[in-house]
A protein has these predicted regions:
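His/Glu-based metal-binding/catalytic segments typifying zinc-dependent metallopeptidases
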Residues: 16-21, 25-29, 210-272, 378
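Acidic/histidine-enriched segments that form metal/cofactor-coordinating
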Residues: 30, 55-56, 60-172, 193, ...
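C-terminal regions of mature proteins
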Residues: 183-189, 333-425
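A glycine-rich, aromatic-flanked flexible loop/lid motif
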Residues: 228-242, 278-300, 308-318, 331, ...
Length: 425
């Protein structure tokens, strides 16, 4: 059974009982991330690193050994948050909570540690072999959703990271690493009452609070006449996305189930498009479909990498593909296959505490708290007619946007009016 509990301090606990597996999965997420970097791009990611550089009682090596001594632990920074994750023996839950709390509250963030960690992070930036894809993804997501947090890269630059001081780190941690800005998600065989007490004793009571208000999903005004966007870069390929943006939001559980089902079926079908897109030995690796649902809107994206001379032929294939499925609908066989995958994932994921906990954490991005079972049953209850109806609504009533990041020029891409004429929907 899944539960949501808010402590008086503002700390949020998401809990789901799982007796099939004896281990416990924990995620501690702080609402900040690179959107809070300000002028010091990469500050959030740098702060995540600094939690492992030593406390007033433990050295850098001792902190790392203590944190990574559990079954499987990690920490990461995204546009939206900084997160600690752990798959641990259930009997060590209190120890894990205390370990993270100690790293947050008692790290020294000394000037010497900051200078030492700069070398590590700068090397990470220099060795980033996928930087074009990262830049393309960040630009694309900002254009798709017009959300401020997608403007900023997580790693930052060598120049901005080298400007970070011990004071910058301390101020950032003091502002954002407070209990009223944290959501803890736990999937465990331990009882809810037991978990609630452990979190209160070993984390909630020892963490500071402040008057920080929840960060909004800030957005800019959409520009309706700029539905084809080109970001010209001196690279030998293009990242092409065809996006269908809906105003429907993610709080509706049934709509989430519909979009997920549509996205998964389209992703299966799009694998067959890869052969059609291998035009003149162009740079096409595969055609993928992604769906996104959040508090602001939802979107379906068809994505590939391609050479500039084949962007128009590629768009022709995609448009023809969308026209066909809107006209004919998904088949019963395609729908049944997706339902079968849903059953399979439920049977396997319910045995994996990390998977169950991942479903809990989606609370941060939606207006509604749901459990893994809620999602499974919502998909299970769909009909083919409902899925086809939602699919047609998505493709016929959404805003179409084409985004190209790479070496293409305007003449290599259709205008939005040309694209709209090609759609028979």
């Amino acid at each position: 059974m899944a539960k949501l509990y808010k402590y008086d301090s503002g700390l949020t606990l998401l809990y789901e009982n799982n007796t099939i597996n004896k281990s416990t999965s924990v995620e501690m997420a702080f609402d900040c991330g690179s959107r809070c970097d300000g002028k010091l791009a990469g500050l959030s990611h740098f702060c995540e690193h600094m939690f492992f550089t030593g406390t007033d009682k433990l050295t850098r090596q001792e902190v790392s050994k203590r944190y990574f001594d559990f079954i499987k632990t990690n920490a990461f920074t995204s546009n939206n948050e900084i997160v600690f994750t752990g798959s641990i023996i259930s009997a060590r839950l209190a120890e894990y909570l205390q370990t993270v709390q100690d790293m947050i509250c008692n790290s020294t963030f000394s000037a010497s540690a900051v200078e030492e960690e700069k070398k590590v992070v700068v090397q990470e930036i220099v060795q980033d072999t996928d930087k074009h894809a990262r830049h393309a993804d960040r630009w694309k997501r900002y254009e798709m959703y017009q959300l401020e947090q997608f403007k900023y890269g997580v790693l930052g630059t060598v120049e901005t990271v080298n400007q970070i001081t011990s004071k910058d780190v301390k101020n950032y941690v003091k502002k954002y690493f407070v209990r009223n800005n944290c959501i803890i998600s736990i999937c465990t065989p331990l009882s809810f009452g037991r978990v609630k007490k452990l979190v209160r004793k070993h984390f909630d009571k020892q963490m500071p609070s402040n008057n920080l208000k929840p960060l909004p999903y800030s957005r800019n005004k959409l520009i309706d006449d700029e539905n084809v966007k080109l970001n010209h870069q001196d690279i030998d390929k293009n990242f092409l996305s065809v996006v269908f943006k809906s105003k429907r939001k993610g709080g509706d559980l049934k709509y989430r189930a519909l979009i997920a089902t549509i996205g998964n079926i389209i992703d299966d079908i799009s694998d067959g498009l890869t052969k059609e897109l291998r035009l003149d030995n162009s740079l096409v690796y595969s055609m993928d479909a992604y769906y996104t649902i959040n508090k602001v809107n939802s979107a379906m994206e068809l994505y590939t990498e391609i050479s500039s001379q084949n962007i128009k032929p590629c768009l022709d294939v995609i448009i023809s593909y969308i026209n066909k499925i809107v006209k004919e609908g998904f088949t019963q066989q395609q729908f049944d296959k997706e339902l079968g995958k849903n059953e399979y994932y439920w049977e396997t994921n319910v045995q994996n505490p990390d998977s169950v906990r991942n479903n809990l954490t989606t609370y941060r991005f939606y207006d509604r708290f749901v459990s893994s079972k809620d999602i499974y049953e919502a998909v299970r209850g769909l009909t083919l007619d409902e899925v086809n109806s939602a699919m047609r609504e998505l493709f016929t009533k959404s805003k179409v946007q084409v985004l190209v990041y790479g070496n293409a020029n305007k003449q290599d891409i259709y205008t939005i009016k040309q694209i709209q004429k090609k759609f028979n929907i």
